């Protein structure tokens, strides 16, 4: 008897879509991957510059084992496809009073650096914070981040075995409040509080458990030679090798539904593709908003989508830099975090912004000869419509501020180098410009993200808007969860 090959359509070639397509094709499914734009990557996008394509999306690669696994499943090695450069110096941090702090992957070096920066008392506090972060990471890694569905029993058991994690798990314990239990120095609270923005939150609303992000970074950070977008290109090539049909410039207009099940997709040009299963690698808010027709509008509950996480103003450009010695990852802190996050909460551009700079051509430790590529990120509110004065205001609040640190660029980038919250809203339908999906604020926010399986049979989710959440490795893990759920469903039907 001839075996029927399952047909899967993956909508969106972001990290989650690529990861799911690769695994499903490797398992024997007939996979078609549809991408509206002309290149893979989703939020891992680029803008042109005189120095070559410059990243305009994620800049930090952690948990490389997630990507090693994708290639190993296919009998290949990640290092044969990409050059990953370990970054022992995680980031250089700057304050306007002239103080700086380098943090690395070496705990003892960090303790010494914090002691020189803020004194012996704060160095001891840092060691205790590092220990808490590592314990939180160990407690939540497998039952939360690596699991297809958060395993509450395993999380509770892990927490009970690690009583030192309890303060971070108390109701109402925000990241800012937790940091105040450790650090007297406001600069250290500001530094580690910034980790809330990694998942689209603020230290005043995000739960204390997000302290585990420090441990994830301390385990290792890598740069990719040529830029982060090279990862998306490598995964697309791997998908092609596995037999995935990649179709770029193929926007999907509708997800089709018949008999209470997702049955295929209709492209913007009117053509239809039938499918046994569909993986939607996009913001789940687009389903609820009807951006893909009325068929999947009830696939995801609204409380799994709203409220929204932060957006950003992102500069991507090439220039010559003069001033303080930049490394690959740099953070120039605001004088007063309340003047950053207060306006953002009110839907406004921050008055006193913390600015993150990725100097992506400095990953090898050498100064480039000529213009080099930069990405600067300033946090912003979601749902903010574009205003005529935004560009001039953002340019001033970015580059005038950096000039106060002695950092200048020649030339200063123009309007085509800036992606505003309204730009992200246009790029990612129904997202309201939110970069990270559901807001991480509240103790249970991480448990509310939609899982791979939706309420509409045959429709599955992947991407940063689904469990386990925002970030490059998290999005890739969501693709794994979607693929494994589909394969489990197929196996159960074949019995």
UniProtKB/Swiss-Prot annotation:
InterPro entries in the cross-refs: Amino_oxidase, carotdesatCrtD, Carotenoid/retinoid_OxRdtase, FAD/NAD-bd_sf, Phytoene_DH_bac_CS
GO biological process, one term: photosynthesis
Keyword hit for Oxidoreductase: yes
EC number: 1.3.99.27
SUPFAM superfamilies, per database record: FAD/NAD(P)-binding domain (SSF51905)
Enzyme class: oxidoreductase
Molecular function (Gene Ontology), one example: oxidoreductase activity, acting on the CH-CH group of donors
Catalytic activity: rhodopin + A = (3E)-3,4-didehydrorhodopin + AH2
Protein's pathway: Carotenoid biosynthesis; spheroidene biosynthesis
PROSITE patterns registered for this protein in UniProt: PHYTOENE_DH (PS00982)
Keyword Transport: no
Family: Belongs to the carotenoid/retinoid oxidoreductase family.
Role summary: It prefer the acyclic carotenoids such as 1-hydroxylycopene, and 1-hydroxy-gamma-carotene, whereas 1-hydroxy-3,4-didehydrolycopene and 1,1-dihydroxylycopene are much less effective.
Record protein name field: Hydroxyneurosporene desaturase
Organism: Cereibacter sphaeroides (strain ATCC 17023 / DSM 158 / JCM 6121 / CCUG 31486 / LMG 2827 / NBRC 12203 / NCIMB 8253 / ATH 2.4.1.)
Organism classification: Bacteria, Pseudomonadati, Pseudomonadota, Alphaproteobacteria, Rhodobacterales
Gene that this polypeptide is encoded by: crtD
């Amino acid at each position: 008897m001839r075996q029927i090959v399952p047909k899967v359509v993956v909508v969106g070639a972001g990290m989650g879509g690529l990861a799911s397509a690769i695994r499903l094709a490797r398992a024997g499914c007939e996979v078609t991957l549809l991408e509206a734009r002309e290149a893979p990557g989703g939020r891992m996008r680029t803008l042109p510059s005189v120095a070559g394509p410059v990243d305009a999306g994620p800049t930090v690669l952690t948990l490389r084992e997630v990507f090693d696994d994708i290639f190993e499943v296919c009998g290949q090695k990640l290092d044969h496809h990409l050059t990953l450069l370990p970054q022992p110096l995680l980031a250089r941090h700057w304050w306007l009073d002239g103080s700086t702090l380098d943090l690395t992957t070496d705990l003892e070096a960090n303790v010494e650096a914090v002691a020189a920066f803020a004194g012996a008392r704060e160095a001891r506090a840092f060691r205790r914070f590092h220990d808490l972060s590592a314990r939180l990471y160990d407690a939540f890694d497998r039952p939360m981040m690596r699991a297809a569905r958060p395993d509450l029993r395993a999380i509770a058991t892990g927490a009970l075995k690690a009583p030192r994690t309890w303060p971070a798990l108390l109701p109402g314990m925000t990241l800012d409040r937790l940091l105040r239990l450790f650090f007297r120095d406001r600069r250290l609270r500001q530094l580690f509080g910034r980790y809330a923005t990694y998942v689209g939150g603020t230290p005043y609303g995000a739960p204390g458990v997000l302290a585990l992000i420090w441990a994830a970074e301390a385990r290792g950070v890598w740069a990719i030679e040529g830029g982060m977008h090279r990862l998306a290109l490598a995964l697309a090539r791997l998908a092609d090798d596995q037999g995935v049909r990649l179709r770029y410039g193929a926007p999907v207009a509708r997800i089709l539904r018949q008999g209470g099940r997702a049955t295929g997709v209709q492209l913007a040009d009117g053509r239809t593709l039938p499918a046994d299963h569909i993986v939607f690698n996009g913001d789940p808010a687009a389903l609820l908003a009807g951006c893909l027709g009325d068929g999947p509008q009830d696939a995801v509950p609204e409380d799994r989508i709203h409220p929204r996480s932060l957006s950003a103003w992102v500069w991507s450009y090439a220039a010559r830099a003069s001033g303080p010695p930049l490394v690959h990852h740099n953070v120039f802190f605001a004088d007063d975090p309340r003047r950053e996050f207060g306006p953002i909460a009110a839907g406004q551009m921050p008055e006193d912004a913390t600015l993150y700079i990725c100097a992506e051509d400095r990953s090898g430790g050498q100064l480039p000869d000529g213009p080099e590529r930069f990405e600067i990120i300033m946090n912003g509110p979601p749902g903010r419509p574009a205003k005529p004065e935004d560009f001039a205001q953002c340019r001033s609040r970015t580059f005038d501020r950096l000039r106060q640190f002695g950092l200048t660029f020649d030339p200063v980038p123009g309007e085509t180098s800036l992606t505003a919250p309204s730009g992200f809203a246009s790029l990612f339908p129904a997202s309201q410009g939110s970069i990270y999906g559901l807001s991480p604020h509240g103790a249970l926010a991480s448990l509310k993200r939609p899982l791979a399986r939706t309420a509409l049979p045959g429709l599955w989710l992947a991407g940063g808007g689904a469990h386990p959440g925002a970030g490059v490795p998290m999005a890739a893990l969501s693709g794994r969860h979607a693929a494994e759920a589909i394969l489990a469903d197929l196996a159960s039907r074949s019995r």
